[in-house]
Amino acid sequence: MRFSLLDRRVERNGVLELARKHHVTIIAYSPLAQGLLNGRFHDQPQMVHNLSGYRKFMPDFRESNIKATQPLIDELKKIATAHQTTPAQIALSWVIQVHGDLVVAIPGATTVRQAEQNARAMRVKLSQVEVQHLDEVSLAIAKK
């Protein structure tokens, strides 16, 4: 199931509660929203014009969505700075932590470096305040 700071539908459509009730783990794919949560497209918006494949046609990568998600990227960067890590690692850490063992993240990686960075997200421990701040910003803009 898709699950990220930008796609939280499983929290609203009953899937999460059903999984909890039946002790089923949800495997969250696209926990970085196809790379949108790493902040690169916000820092360099022209990168959107170089997208290929299906991402080229995804509404998530339209200029209007890049602007709409900027507050979340700003919060991810702020928390990442405090933890001396990356926004992507903070976004992954949130997915890993927010529902405990009920959700497992499977981020994609196209390079060894990305895979290593993704794995490092398991070391990041967000405080309740940080989780709350991410929740507040995320809930204002996420798919529900």
What are these regions (language model features)?
Residues 1-143:
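Beta/alpha (TIM)-barrel catalytic core signal, keyed to glycine-rich beta->alpha loops juxtaposed to Asp/Glu
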